[in-house]
Amino acid sequence: MHNYLDFEKPISDLEGKIIELKKLATEDESIDTTDEIGRLEVRVREAIVEIYSKLNPWQKTQVARHPQRPHFVDYAKTLFQEFTPLAGDRKFSEDAAIQAGLARFRGQPVAVIGQEKGNDTKSRLKHNFGSPRPEGYRKAIRILEMADRFGLPVISLVDTAGAYPGVGAEERGQAEAIARSTEMCLGVKVPLVSVVIGEGGSGGAIAIATGNKVYMLEHSIYSVISPEGAASILWRDSTRAREAATNMKITAEDLKSLGVIDGIISEPLGGAHRDPDSVIAATGDVIASALAEMAPRSGEQLRNDRRQKFLAMGRNL
């Protein structure tokens, strides 16, 4: 069953009528609803085009958080072969919010790091709603070190509202873990491609997104804080999240114009949740192209390019 966002009501109403007509035709074969269903399907497509061609930043935030949007595990199943996840940080514990391991990508050995939110109550609790603890970032560091040692390109898929802010996480060095992970991303002498597939929240996202090439899906978001968090800090009113989202420049178009990301991956009509297979395939093509472009570069050049990219970003924004 499709989950509709509040601004998708016209689409919901039309698709609801289509479902009713199909049910009616099933119950009474003498009734021909083919033509009416065809007309309604055309209207659905027109409604989707009309709505999704002018999404505001807050609506894009809602799409980025859509519960049926493909998550890391969906990309991993399709994009990677022989994915072997590694567990634990060898210091304290395992954190399922970050999935990391070794795999093959179109025949090429790679290291993979991603944030997983989960898709139902049980899995969301297991993955801590995609908010990593220090152990997750230290696990990512393990994978980055391994990739650097064996010359494996790194692919990271970002989807988090932010790092977990709990007391225990702070006591175990959350800030240090994020900083070390970011430092490691900047230091490896292998290609590093990052894609924001949903939410890219604050340091919790950038800790695995400091890549040579950084991309965003068309309806994903990337920001220093969530719109609700920004509204709470700026105006002491989280209900002004829509206003905050507009002012924060969090959309893929905004960040491309600012030079924060290198490219935007188009989503299917109506968002990635309406056609996960096509957006996953498109993401794979972009990653493959980026890796091919970087293949001739030396490890030293890759590292220097990455560092200069982010230093320039800090100077120019």
Curated annotation (Swiss-Prot):
Pathway: Lipid metabolism; malonyl-CoA biosynthesis; malonyl-CoA from acetyl-CoA: step 1/1
Every CoA carboxyltransferase C-terminal domain range: 40-293
EC numbers: 2.1.3.15
Localization per record: Cytoplasm
Catalysed reaction, written as an equation: N(6)-carboxybiotinyl-L-lysyl-[protein] + acetyl-CoA = N(6)-biotinyl-L-lysyl-[protein] + malonyl-CoA
Pfam short name (any one): ACCA
MF terms in GO: acetyl-CoA carboxylase activity; ATP binding; carboxyl- or carbamoyltransferase activity
Keywords, ordered alphabetically: ATP-binding, Cytoplasm, Fatty acid biosynthesis, Fatty acid metabolism, Lipid biosynthesis, Lipid metabolism, Nucleotide-binding, Transferase
PANTHER family listed in its UniProt record: ACETYL-COENZYME A CARBOXYLASE CARBOXYL TRANSFERASE SUBUNIT ALPHA (PTHR42853), ACETYL-COENZYME A CARBOXYLASE CARBOXYL TRANSFERASE SUBUNIT ALPHA, CHLOROPLASTIC (PTHR42853:SF3)
Similarity comment: Belongs to the AccA family.
Function: Component of the acetyl coenzyme A carboxylase (ACC) complex. First, biotin carboxylase catalyzes the carboxylation of biotin on its carrier protein (BCCP) and then the CO(2) group is transferred by the carboxyltransferase to acetyl-CoA to form malonyl-CoA.
Name this protein carries in UniProt: Acetyl-coenzyme A carboxylase carboxyl transferase subunit alpha
Species of the source: Rhizobium johnstonii (strain DSM 114642 / LMG 32736 / 3841)
Name of encoding gene: accA
